[in-house]
Every structure is written in structure tokens, then in C-alpha cells.
Design a protein with these regions (language model features):
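Conserved adenosine/adenylate-binding substructure
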Residues: 38, 110-114, 245-248, 312-369, ...
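Short low-complexity, flexible loop/linker segments enriched in glycine and/or proline
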Residues: 324-329, 373-376, 513-516
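Short, solvent-exposed helix-helix connector turns and helix-capping sites enriched
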Residues: 102, 151, 383-387, 494
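A mobile, often basic/glycine-rich helix-loop segment
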Residues: 367-392
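Hydrophobic (often cysteine-bearing) scaffold residues that line and stabilize catalytic clefts
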Residues: 90, 109, 166, 225-229, ...
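Short, well-ordered alpha-helices that flank and scaffold nucleotide-derived cofactor binding pockets
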Residues: 263-267, 348, 573
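Adenosyl-5′-phosphate
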Residues: 1-4, 8-10, 104, 188-193, ...
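Cysteine-centered catalytic environments shared across enzyme families
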Residues: 1-315, 321-324, 343, 595-599
Length: 600
């Protein structure tokens, strides 16, 4: 929910015309309410004096801006040996952490954070981003100055700047190859990657990694590993101990992850928080696909509790493309999030009920893992008898053929180079470090901020992620059960009907229907008028043909088809290009290089 923008120029800001009033105001009508400026720094934000302060220490003069969560503040106070009764600002606490441990001290924080340290004497700037990217930092290097902000949009609105389109990113976006977590659709604007910081000194920028996840052998017994996971799940949902918020909301799909978050909070909370759940239902769809999408029977297992204030909405009434201009205004650049209407509707309803703290079960399946990388490890290490046994029991439990499971898990990702060189843990780590998670958090975070909501992701707790990475691989998928260790850890807390489910809703059916019924006019209009910048990047005739076929039989494209995704990506990008300001004068077929430096 923190929003900021800053300009630092150690040659002096005098004579520079810097305009930081955003052209966009969120629903809370709260712009940049706080400001700091001197001859070299202009900093505007919507936080408090907890977030930004000036310090004179160790013969230096430092401007510090930070945003940390309460749980991490408690941890840091203990780590630094500070008396709990001492009233210390977040900014001073983070400065003390840096003085004592340097950049490596940031590993002490388990949740989202921002830490910006401006050394006014040595003329040095450092901007740190958390381990997974819950908090965002964008930067723009221009005219001997560096601009920092919590959002792309803030920097794109800076006056008197000429920007150029990043055509490489556009191409990758359209072809689902955009794996970068540093660049944006504008060459001049970049992002600090998760677990990294940028250092700006003598008009040069370095991007430096300050931490990485540890992989190590786990010698604990299976039972101890299960109990360890249960402990960390409890710890990760134990938020707002000071009861700053009287109400806490939960996005509740009815899946295992969202059900785990709300169930653990409800089971272990020792506060008077009121619990609100927000769920999408699809009860009015054709009966042929109703059971493939609607999860209300699972949602009701949670929402029937008398201490939960349930708010359900009809997912059929919503679509992302029908409000595309709104999303582009909030996010500022193209995005790939076809089901964005779900968190948006939840945030909207939450704000109406004065719920301004929300918990989200995002990516529990990624963090804990379904465990199929264990099957791959067995295959590449020639443990084929064990592999066949695991596939056989999985086949019987999921009612899928052994051939289908083998093809999907082994053959579809087969590589000769993996033989005798494949590690299930390293594969899990690669998935965790994918840029997809960071991008999804950024997008949801901007939406949450629009409604004045602070969003929390218990499964993205750093300690929990590292623990799950090091769980023995055969505990992640055992006896045919994906995420076996999670299902054991939540036993007795999450309703059995949810804990034992082996299916998952396929929202692709809802997406295809909304395209054909609700978004047909917009899609046709965008396909008929491609922006000149996009024509050389995509086969429009093929896409138009696929769209016409999809309108005839949308159900055919709801599973294992890239057509809906291709249409969504094209429409979003094309609409954004048409809405660009006149200041975007040139096209450049390049991606700005971001050089990563090892932390010393």
C-alpha cells in the first residue's frame, strides 16, 4: 500500500523542473501526503514519519526510506538487542540493521520490504527489494539523476522525459517467453530484482544480489518435517499482533492453499479480529461445465463457520477485458493476468466493508510443490522400478492412465542432459525463482493499493519457502498424493473434504465463455486495428482464424490450448499501445541490459 517516488541528483536539483503529482489517483483519494527535499533529493510518499527520516550517525548523513511488516520489526528488535519498550522508528531500525550486518542483514526479514539508503556525504544510493518481490522498486536513470518509485506508472508520468518502446519485451510477451524480472515495456525504466539491491554511485548503477535460498540435506524424520511445516504455517499467518486492523479479509477459492491460510488463522489467532472471506462462484453456468469451475461446495466447508463473514460474488458477472482500460490505468503497462477480475472484485467488496488487510493463499502449490520433480529425479537417476510404483498409485488415485502421467511429467520435459545430473530440489528452486510469481504479486499489489488495502502472502514467507525447498523430495509426493507433506500438516485444521480433494477448478472455461459472450466486441475491434508497433511481432491472420474457431466452440479451447492466452496478451498489449502518450516518440528493437554484480 506504500506509494513513493524520489529523484536524487548529487550535482544538485536546482533549476530542474520536477513534477511529481501523479495523473492518477487511487480510490482512497490519497496521493503523496508526505514530502522531503533538499538540494539533492526530492522524496514524496503516502506513508508516515515511520517510513522516512534523516539521520546523522557515524560521521555520516543518511536519508532512509523503508517499509517493513510488524512481524519483521519484532524479529529485528530481538536480533539487534533493542529494548522492546524503546519506541524506535522503522527507518532507524533498518539503518541499525544495515550498520551492523551490511547488505547481508536483509536476509533477516521474512516478509515483503523496501529499504532505500541515501548517503548524502558519500553521494551513494542503495535500494533493496525483498526476497520474492512483494514490494516493488522501479528506477529510471536520466540526466545524471536516478528516479526511484514503487510503481512503473509513477516513473512513466515523470515530465520532460522521452521514452522508447522495448520491442524485445513486447515480442517475448506475445510469445510467452518473457522471463525477465528486471525490464519493463519501456527501455529506460527497470525494476530491482527480488533478493537484489541497486547501488547508484558516480552516476553508475550496479545491480547486486544480497541473498539466495539455501539448499541442504534434511536429516529430520518424516514426522518432524511435517510438524516443522505445520509450525511455520502457523507462524506465517500470525499477523497484525498489535490489532492495527479490526478486520482481516481472505480471498477464498476453496482450494487447499486459500483454505489453509484462513483455517490456520482462525485456529490459532489469539486476537479479536473479525474474519471476512471473499469467494467467486459460478452457479449459473451450463451444467456440463459447472462442476469443472464452481467450487462453492468446498468454499462452504469454510464459510459455514459462524465466526466467518462470508461474501460471495458471481464470477460470471466479471471479466478482465471488460475493464481493461481501468487495469491499464492502475498497472501502467501490459500484464498477463486473465483472471485479474477475481482479486479486483474481492478488493472492491473488501473496501466497501472497511476491510483493509487481506491475506492471500497465492502459490502455495509452488512453494510446497506438487512434488512431481521427485518423479523426474527418479527417472533421470534410473530408479525406474520406484518411479513405476509411484506412477501406478498416482494413476489409481487420480483416475488417470499411467501413460498420461508418464507423458505429462517425464516426456514433455525430457532432456538427455538431465541424466545423472537432475536434482528435485534444484528443479523446485528454479520454479520458485521464476519471474511469474513476482509479476503476479506486483499486479495484485497495485490493485490492492488502489483500494487502500495491504495484502499479505503467508506462503511467500522467506523462512517457509526455504523450509519447503529442503523438505525431503519423497514427502512432497507420496502414496499418489501431490503435496503430501502439506496435506499431513493441515490434518485436523482444514476440513477433510478440502484436504483430500484431488481436483482443481479449471477457470479456463469461464475465461473462454467471457471472451465469447462479454468481450467479443472488444476483441473484434482490437484484432481489426493492430497498432503499427505490433504488426511485425505476430501472425494476425492465424490469430483471427483461431478466434473465429473459438467463438464456435469455446469449450474446446478451455484446456491445453494457448489460443485464449494469445488473444488476451494481444488485446492487452494492443490496447496499451493505442493509449500511449505522445511523448513516446521512438521505437527501439533492443532490451536495455541490466548487469548483475556479485555481492562482496
Amino acid at each position: 500500500m506504500i506509494n513513493f517516488i524520489a529523484c536524487i541528483d548529487f550535482e544538485g536539483l536546482k533549476g530542474k523542473n520536477i513534477y511529481f503529482e501523479s495523473k492518477y489517483h487511487d480510490q482512497t483519494k490519497q496521493g503523496f501526503t508526505q514530502s522531503y527535499n533538499n538540494d539533492y533529493v526530492l522524496f514524496r510518499h503516502n506513508g508516515s514519519d515511520e517510513n522516512l527520516d534523516l539521520f546523522t550517525k557515524k560521521d555520516g548523513k543518511f536519508l532512509v526510506f523503508t517499509k517493513i511488516f510488524e512481524e519483521d520489526k519484532i524479529t529485528l528488535i530481538k536480533k539487534l538487542g533493542i529494548n522492546e519498550n524503546v519506541n524506535i522508528k522503522d527507518s532507524e531500525l533498518m539503518l541499525e540493521l544495515y550498520f551492523k550486518f551490511g547488505a547481508a542483514g536483509m536476509k533477516c526479514l521474512s516478509n515483503g520490504f523496501i529499504f532505500i539508503l541515501i548517503d548524502l556525504i558519500k553521494e551513494n544510493v542503495m535500494a533493496f527489494r525483498d526476497h520474492i518481490g512483494i514490494k516493488n522498486i522501479c528506477y529510471l536513470h536520466s540526466d545524471n539523476s536516478i528516479y526511484l518509485s514503487s510503481s512503473f506508472r509513477n516513473l512513466f508520468n515523470v515530465n520532460n522525459k522521452n521514452f522508447s518502446l522495448n520491442l524485445d519485451k513486447m515480442d517475448n510477451f506475445l510469445n510467452f517467453k518473457d522471463s525477465s524480472n528486471t525490464n519493463t515495456f519501456i527501455n529506460e525504466i527497470n525494476k530491482v530484482p527480488p533478493s537484489h539491491f541497486i547501488e547508484y554511485h558516480q552516476d553508475q548503477i550496479k545491480v547486486i544480489q544480497y541473498s539466495e535460498y539455501r539448499l541442504e540435506d534434511n536429516l529430520a524424520t518424516a514426522n518432524d518435517q511435517i510438524n516443522g511445516l505445520k509450525h511455520l504455517l502457523k507462524k506465517s499467518v500470525y499477523i497484525d499482533k498489535s490489532c492495527k486492523y479490526s478486520k482481516i479479509g481472505f480471498t477464498m477459492s476453496g482450494g487447499i492453499d486459500s483454505s489453509t491460510v484462513i483455517s490456520f488463522f482462525r485456529e490459532f489467532k489469539d486476537s479479536a479480529h473479525k474474519i471476512f472471506s471473499f469467494s467467486a462462484q459460478y452457479k449459473h453456468l451450463d451444467k456440463k461445465i459447472l462442476n469443472l469451475i464452481d467450487e462453492s461446495e468446498y468454499q462452504n466447508e469454510i464459510n459455514k463457520s459462524t465466526d466467518i463473514y462470508d461474501t460471495s460474488f458471481d464470477g460470471q458477472d466479471e471479466s478482465t477485458l471488460s475493464k481493461l482500460d481501468f487495469y491499464l490505468e492502475v498497472i501502467g503497462q501490459p500484464f498477463f493476468f486473465p483472471n485479474l477480475y477475481l482479486p479486483n472484485k474481492a478488493f472492491s467488496l473488501a473496501s466497501e466493508k472497511d476491510v483493509y488487510l487481506m491475506m492471500n493463499g497465492n502459490d502455495g502449490d509452488t512453494v510446497v510443490s506438487h512434488g512431481y520433480e521427485y518423479f523426474q529425479e527418479l527417472f533421470y537417476n534410473l530408479r525406474w522400478i520406484k518411479l513405476l510404483k509411484e506412477i501406478d498409485v498416482t494413476s489409481r488415485l487420480r483416475k488417470q492412465s499411467r501413460r498420461f502421467i508418464f507423458k505429462r511429467i517425464i516426456l514433455n520435459s525430457f532432456s538427455l542432459s538431465n541424466f545423472f545430473n537432475f536434482s528435485a530440489k534444484k528443479k523446485h528452486l528454479d520454479v520458485i525463482c521464476s519471474s511469474n510469481h513476482t509479476k503476479a504479486i506486483e499486479i495484485q499489489g497495485l490493485l490492492a493499493s488502489y483500494y487502500g488495502i495491504e495484502e499479505r502472502y503467508p506462503f511467500y514467507n522467506r523462512e517457509l519457502i526455504e523450509y519447503c525447498l529442503n523438505v525431503t523430495p519423497d514427502l512432497k509426493n507420496k502414496h499418489g498424493q501431490a503435496r503430501y507433506i502439506l496435506k499431513e500438516a493441515i490434518k485436523g485444521i482444514v476440513p477433510e473434504k478440502i484436504r483430500k480433494r484431488v481436483t482443481k477448478a479449471n477457470l479456463g472455461h469461464a475465461l473462454c465463455l467471457s471472451f465469447v459472450v462479454k468481450d467479443n466486441e472488444l476483441i473484434n475491434a482490437q484484432l481489426s486495428k493492430p497498432n503499427p508497433a505490433i504488426r511485425e511481432l505476430i501472425d494476425l491472420e492465424d490469430l483471427r482464424s483461431s478466434w473465429e474457431n473459438m467463438k464456435v466452440d469455446p469449450r474446446k479451447y478451455a484446456t491445453n490450448s494457448l489460443v485464449p492466452s494469445r488473444i488476451f496478451a494481444y488485446v492487452v498489449l494492443n490496447r496499451w499501445l493505442d493509449s500511449l502518450p505522445l511523448k513516446l516518440k521512438k521505437l527501439e528493437n533492443k532490451t536495455q541490459n541490466v548487469y548483475l554484480h556479485p555481492y562482496e
